[in-house]
Amino acid sequence: MDHIRNFSIIAHIDHGKSTLADRIIQLCGGLSDREMESQVLDSMDLERERGITIKAQTAALTYRARDGKVYNLNLIDTPGHVDFSYEVSRSLSACEGALLVVDASQGVEAQTVANCYTAIELGVEVVPVLNKIDLPAANPENAIAEIEDVIGIDAMDAVRCSAKTGLGVEDVLESLIAKVPPPKGDPDAPLQALIIDSWFDNYVGVVMLVRIVNGTLRPKEKIKLMATDAQYSVEHVGVFTPKSRNLESLSAGQVGFIIAGIKELTAAKVGDTVTHATKSAPEPLPGFKEVKPQVFAGLYPVEANQYDALRESLEKLKLNDASLQYEPEVSQALGFGFRCGFLGLLHMEIVQERLEREFDMDLITTAPTVVYEVVQSDGATIMVENPAKMPEPARIAEIREPIVTVNLYMPQDYVGSVITLCEQKRGTQINMQYHGRQVQLTYEIPMAEIVLDFFDRLKSVSRGYASMDYEFKEYRTSDVVKVDMLINGDKVDALSIIVHRSQSQYRGREVAAKMREIIPRQMYDVAIQAAIGAHIIARENIKALRKNVLAKCYGGDITRKKKLLEKQKEGKKRMKQVGSVEIPQEAFLAILRVEDK
């Protein structure tokens, strides 16, 4: 066991984490040159395209060190984005060490810091690495100063490397072996294995990626999952050297996979503990929690007959993404669809994109909303994640909205514009610190304000230099109201929005104006109104299209013309009573886009 090292790589988006992983795998001969492609561990097309890591992956590598000993290195690739922070904490708790990769030309960024603090809290040894030192803009001294200043770990002897050219990658591994302690654990104790990740394979069912903490596991043994108490019999165990390789057994300190004929992914929850069914461990490993979705949106098929196909696609996605939640819902305007819960905005975009790309779905997505806590006048508290489910204003005692703590990092030139943005978003400043040229701002901002377009706006006011991460803090009483949109006096549920009272007039007017542009003219007048409860706050009219009924009367008597006009008016009136206004798809998307222009 002294020769095993379990480590993961922490880095901000684009600081070269996956490239470094590629180089390490190449150096240890995990794949032949023919099979080597860039970003080996990012197996989803989407991960490659966006250059982000979504699911955790592992590689068990052998490395002959300079002292002649052969070490087993287990690389656990973690997602770097804040939406997947629970997956990150699980991956990190399976390691004893983490390589902190910092781009020498850019210095420390927000997500790096967030994940690094997680690592330090979990007691993981952090080894700083400066990447991209081959760039002309690289400034290693500055980056070292930032690591020490912001994160507070000693970085004087940080390894310098360039993952692109392969320069210094061996030094990274040597430094890893020297600094990271070998795993502790007893191969003869009762089995305890932490599930780092799980996914569904069409041939063998659910594959669980685990780190064995204590004990030994062999095929044909009975195992039990401690969160659900479900029992299964093990078919295969093994490791990934990115390719899978079956082994006789997995013992304490190793990272590998278990295949046990599990049919649904919900049984194998990330962070759960696997143990033997008979000689089971007295207690599960700490840190397991159910992941709660933070952001909700409705997904509807563009064609109503695609509903079943959408349900199947969601079921298949759920096999690989246990944090996705969905339930069927019906909207008067959009027909049948699903209300889906996501970890955050990036997660939502990825799910949408995967549905469109892998399953060929055409989707309409309603505006993302967060979960509000509503205390009713009879004292009961309900959680509302859909504006249509919000009770009538008379029955509400108070509404509490989720508040998140946001950490922002940016060069000092952009502090002013970022502060202005946070103020617009009803943020309260908690803290502000200068680290060299970088500034760290801490704000408390309502989650609803972040969900819409905070991230995009932040990138645009700071020219892409600011980075952020957020975590949920608490529910706080707030003056939020539900704005309904009425078309000819009928509520359109899919267009309802929940906003702060201070912005309700403005937003109501804006949505109404937008709808006027988008809804095509009908044969009769259409009134678009925005209302809070029974109180109308904005109105727009769409004028009717009319045929020129007087075209055939040259000259002639005025009463004849009047008769024809009256007749037309009557017809329009009748039409208006029976007609229903077609609302085009763009109207729903427009709601998303009016957010704070």
From Swiss-Prot:
Keywords: Cell inner membrane, Cell membrane, GTP-binding, Hydrolase, Membrane, Nucleotide-binding, Protein biosynthesis. Residues 2-184 form the tr-type G domain. Pfam families: EFG_C (PF00679), GTP_EFTU (PF00009), GTP_EFTU_D2 (PF03144), LepA_C (PF06421). HAMAP family: LepA. SMART domains: EFG_C (SM00838). Its main location: membrane. Belongs to the TRAFAC class translation factor GTPase superfamily. Classic translation factor GTPase family. LepA subfamily. SUPFAM superfamilies: EF-G C-terminal domain-like, P-loop containing nucleoside triphosphate hydrolases, Translation proteins. This is Elongation factor 4. One of its GO terms (cellular component) is plasma membrane. It comes from the Bacteria. One of its GO terms (biological process) is positive regulation of translation. One of its GO terms (molecular function) is ribosome binding. The gene is lepA. Its EC number is 3.6.5.n1. It is a peripheral membrane protein. GTP binds at residues 14-19, 131-134. Required for accurate and efficient protein synthesis under certain stress conditions. May act as a fidelity factor of the translation reaction, by catalyzing a one-codon backward translocation of tRNAs on improperly translocated ribosomes. Back-translocation proceeds from a post-translocation (POST) complex to a pre-translocation (PRE) complex, thus giving elongation factor G a second chance to translocate the tRNAs correctly. Binds to ribosomes in a GTP-dependent manner. It catalyses: GTP + H2O = GDP + phosphate + H(+). It is found in: Cell inner membrane. The keyword Transcription regulation does not apply.
